[in-house]
Amino acid sequence: MKKVIILIFMLSTSLLYNCKNQDNEKIVSIGGSTTVSPILDEMILRYNKINNNTKVTYDAQGSSVGINGLFNKIYKIAISSRDLTKEEIEQGAKETVFAYDALIFITSPEIKITNITEENLAKILNGEIQNWKQVGGPDAKINFINRDSSSGSYSSIKDLLLNKIFKTHEEAQFRQDGIVVKSNGEVIEKTSLTPHSIGYIGLGYAKNSIEKGLNILSVNSTYPTKETINSNKYTIKRNLIIVTNNKYEDKSVTQFIDFMTSSTGQDIVEEQGFLGIKT
């Protein structure tokens, strides 16, 4: 009987301890850009190992989905690969840059051109140029692999290229016959499977595209590397930002943001093929 009482006491103590731990555990839910998934996945893996009382999660559904989720209290932090809109700032969104990225253009293996001008690139994206022959390639229709409109990459290309080259709103629109996919990985996969195709991805995915046998284009005779991006020779580049709302910030949120911008966090950014803010 005495042994049974001791066993019950030990089980009760264990359950009480576990419940207390669960009550004390802070959940930091993050949502946003698919581009930064490799960075966030590795950061979270390392952070969760050294912070027993905090569990960080990442839901890569796109920059706009992440920011909307922040305002709707689904996420405590959003990660965006596009700039905040005026409306988002007015709603209380606050940004912190934690990395830099460039958008690079990849083509299927049979496209042998190595360089393209910004103007011709923009004309491919809006449909003014329809055949590879018009830019020195084979006589074949151009198949364009595009991102969905909630993607930060989609918005960034529109701002950095289409709006830069074209003067009217009508011209600065993506062509309607693009094949729409939801992530950088899907762009690489679709481009590898679709003859005579072109798509765009983040710099951190360059190695993956090369492994698939795809070509990376120089733009205005400049190949995208960390050096040409840092020196502003390659100009199709953007900030990767942490988005918070002052109304919902707490200590667990600020601690993870501090980790992201720390030397350890920045090493992870570089390891994943992107550019750190302290580069």
From Swiss-Prot:
<keyword id="KW-0472">Membrane</keyword>
<comment type="subunit">
    <text>Monomer (in vitro). The complex is composed of two ATP-binding proteins (PstB), two transmembrane proteins (PstC and PstA) and a solute-binding protein (PstS).</text>
</comment>
<keyword id="KW-0592">Phosphate transport</keyword>
<feature type="lipid moiety-binding region" description="S-diacylglycerol cysteine">
    <location>
        <position position="19"/>
    </location>
</feature>
<dbReference type="GO" id="GO:0005315">
    <property type="term" value="F:phosphate transmembrane transporter activity"/>
</dbReference>
<dbReference type="InterPro" id="IPR050811">
    <property type="entry name" value="Phosphate_ABC_transporter"/>
</dbReference>
<dbReference type="Pfam" id="PF12849">
    <property type="entry name" value="PBP_like_2"/>
</dbReference>
<keyword id="KW-0732">Signal</keyword>
<feature type="signal peptide">
    <location>
        <begin position="1"/>
        <end position="18"/>
    </location>
</feature>
<keyword id="KW-0813">Transport</keyword>
<comment type="function">
    <text>Binds inorganic phosphate with a Kd of 1.2 uM. Part of the ABC transporter complex PstSACB involved in phosphate import.</text>
</comment>
<feature type="binding site">
    <location>
        <begin position="151"/>
        <end position="153"/>
    </location>
    <ligand>
        <name>phosphate</name>
    </ligand>
</feature>
<keyword id="KW-0449">Lipoprotein</keyword>
<feature type="binding site">
    <location>
        <position position="63"/>
    </location>
    <ligand>
        <name>phosphate</name>
    </ligand>
</feature>
<keyword id="KW-1003">Cell membrane</keyword>
<dbReference type="GO" id="GO:0006817">
    <property type="term" value="P:phosphate ion transport"/>
</dbReference>
<protein>
    <recommendedName>
        <fullName>Phosphate-binding protein PstS</fullName>
    </recommendedName>
</protein>
<comment type="similarity">
    <text>Belongs to the PstS family.</text>
</comment>
<keyword id="KW-0564">Palmitate</keyword>
<dbReference type="GO" id="GO:0043190">
    <property type="term" value="C:ATP-binding cassette (ABC) transporter complex"/>
</dbReference>
<feature type="lipid moiety-binding region" description="N-palmitoyl cysteine">
    <location>
        <position position="19"/>
    </location>
</feature>
<dbReference type="InterPro" id="IPR024370">
    <property type="entry name" value="PBP_domain"/>
</dbReference>
<feature type="binding site">
    <location>
        <begin position="33"/>
        <end position="35"/>
    </location>
    <ligand>
        <name>phosphate</name>
    </ligand>
</feature>
